[in-house]
Amino acid sequence: MSLVGVHNEWDPLEEVVVGTARRPCAGPDRSLLAVEYAEYAGPGRWQEVPTGPYPDRALKETEDELEELCEELRGLGVTVRRPGARDSAAPVRTPDWESDGYGDLCPRDGLLVVGDTVIEAPMALRARFLESLAYKELLVEYLAAGSRWISAPKPRLAEGMYSPSGPSGERLRDLEPVFDAANVLRLGTDLLYLVSDSGNELGARWLQSALGAAYTVHPCRGLYSSTHIDSTLVPLRPGLVLVNPARVTDDNLPGVLRTWQRIECPALAGLGYAGDVPHCSTWIGMSLLVVRPGLVVVDSRHRELMRVLERHGVDVLPLKLTHARMLGGGFHGVTLDIRRTGALETYRF
């Protein structure tokens, strides 16, 4: 029996990978500027972008908070796995470029589980080119136990791939398939794919070809131009979705969600961050981990969000990721669901 099996974002969680805050850093190169900090692409502003190692104290606090998350999930009967130890900050080189490594905080960004298949995504940042090495032993174990394991074609990520000065949402050119796994949400037979600065059109086309006729990949255009979809849409259970009111409108809401009940996320607490420039906005607080229908992990500082969820019959497990804005990972991002109960269904109501 395969140890891998996920069909959506909400079925009861049985096994999960939780990332680590050991030695993450931000590598200064063209891809980081285009994908994460394009507003600093002008003359003389590159130096304002935070690069290099993160503060030790923040990493220690984050690692402690991740361990608390692990313990809570274990207490709920969930099997918890962690990345293998490695020097994630070691330089990454190809014939075209060189970058510092990135880190292994967010397994969600690089690996996508669809059914019994684990897919290595062709990630947009050069620094993350070899990030899947942190999970290699786990992937081999899952393969030996009956899962499928495929990898998208390794992208070249040459200079021409990026357009830092281009319009938001068009800074990742369509020269080869490139996308982060966190650009994708699973709704049974339907997958939402965010076309943005961390996922291009060719990426959606490759994903559809890899998954075949059993699935429909829906490219979401004009929804959110920056990175990842989990701070914009959060499916909570069949027919109920949390939406970001600053981004989602009647016009750009994906068609498969139009018959679902929508909950607008309230304004989130203005969490602090170390340094002068945050990695992400306060909407990182929408990055929730659904443990099962009716229970989600949410940052305890977002009290109004917790109240809204509870009014809609969703219980909360309040925990904390103090440095989410600095490190760029909420509870959805720092986890990768490996197995959930349930079967493949279609959720078009």
UniProtKB/Swiss-Prot annotation:
Q: Where is this site: Corresponds to active site cysteine in strB1?
A: G333
Pathway it works in: Antibiotic biosynthesis; streptomycin biosynthesis
Q: Which reaction does this enzyme catalyse, per its entry?
A: 1-amino-1-deoxy-scyllo-inositol 4-phosphate + L-arginine = 1-guanidino-1-deoxy-scyllo-inositol 4-phosphate + L-ornithine
Top-level enzyme category: transferase
Q: What is its EC number?
A: 2.1.4.2
Q: Which GO terms describe its biological process?
A: streptomycin biosynthetic process
Q: Cross-referenced SUPFAM superfamilies, in alphabetical order?
A: Pentein
Recorded GO terms, molecular function? scyllo-inosamine-4-phosphate amidinotransferase activity
Keywords for this protein: Antibiotic biosynthesis, Streptomycin biosynthesis, Transferase
Q: What function does the entry list?
A: It is not obvious if strB2 participates in streptomycin biosynthesis as an inosamine-phosphate amidinotransferase. Attempt to measure its activity have failed and the nucleophilic cysteine which is the key residue for amidine transfer is not conserved but replaced by a glycine residue.
Family statement drawn from the similarity comment of this UniProt entry: Belongs to the amidinotransferase family.
Q: What is this protein called?
A: Putative inosamine-phosphate amidinotransferase 2
